[in-house]
């Protein structure tokens, strides 16, 4: 596997070149019960397995999962198998329809490919998201504030989202790398069709890249670039991205603080 240092990738995959087979073992999944998620990336032309994926942020595959109502989120990394498949032993927390975004970068691809998949667990009610804009989050004694530049976010225009982290009213300055980055940000639109993923590096894209070569990261998967301000390890961490359309978006930001990966969540509105 080739090592690659990328901060952003395309959202939608190129269906003319790549496909993703997805099965669960067992096929019927019950909440809280063990299940194996198996992903097999393939060449679309001849249906052969893609066995040489690039390593991006220390992993060949990043799997982002959300519940249908966007109240639950997970960031996992399926393990490579000799036959070219990737497996993850998992337990879904509740009955629901889950949306899975499998993010890979084939060796012969110029950017990443994101595959949007779905799995219904138990008797899912499929409650729609009810998102209310919120730029503050508290958890485990830490306070997180999301600041945007510009303040009014606009579809199709670049924006910088800065997360300010504090504890006891003091800025946190001991943020450590997580998967080769100071932080990770995942952004998903209210309809779950647009997916953005940002990291602390110097270039950015979105799913709009698949629709518009100008690049950004969204639609059905993407990444945005991230830089950090002030001290290299906090308290401000800034992510640059581009929202592909107007509407509400759920934002998850992950940081490694005091040896633990902590996840903050927000909701932003884009005009």
Predicted regions and their residues:
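Intrinsically disordered, low-complexity terminal tails/loops enriched in metal-binding residues
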Residues: 1-271
């Amino acid at each position: 596997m080739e090592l690659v240092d990328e901060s952003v990738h395309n959202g939608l995959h190129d269906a003319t070149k790549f496909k993703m087979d997805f099965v669960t073992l067992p096929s019927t999944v019950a909440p809280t019960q063990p299940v194996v998620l198996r992903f097999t990336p393939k060449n679309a032309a001849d249906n052969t397995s893609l066995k040489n994926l690039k390593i991006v942020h220390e992993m060949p595959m990043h799997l982002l999962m959300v519940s249908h109502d966007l109240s639950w989120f997970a960031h996992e990394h399926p393990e490579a198998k000799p036959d070219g498949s990737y497996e993850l032993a998992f337990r879904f927390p509740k009955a629901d329809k889950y949306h899975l975004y499998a993010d890979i970068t084939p060796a012969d691809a110029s950017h990443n490919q994101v595959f949007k998949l779905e799995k219904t667990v138990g008797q899912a009610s499929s409650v729609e998201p009810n998102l209310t804009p919120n730029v503050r989050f508290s958890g485990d004694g830490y306070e997180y504030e999301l600041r945007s530049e510009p303040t009014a976010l606009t579809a199709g225009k670049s924006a910088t989202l800065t997360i300010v982290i504090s504890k006891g009213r003091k800025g946190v300055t001991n943020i450590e790398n997580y998967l080769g980055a100071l932080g990770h940000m995942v952004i998903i639109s209210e309809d779950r069709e647009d997916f953005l993923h940002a990291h602390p590096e110097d270039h950015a894209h979105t799913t709009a890249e698949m629709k518009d070569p100008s690049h950004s990261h969204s639609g059905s998967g993407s990444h945005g670039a991230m830089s950090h301000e002030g001290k290299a390890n906090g308290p401000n961490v800034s992510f640059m991205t581009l929202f592909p359309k107007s509407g509400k978006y759920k934002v998850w930001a992950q940081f490694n603080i005091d040896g633990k990966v902590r996840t903050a969540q927000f909701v932003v509105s884009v005009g």
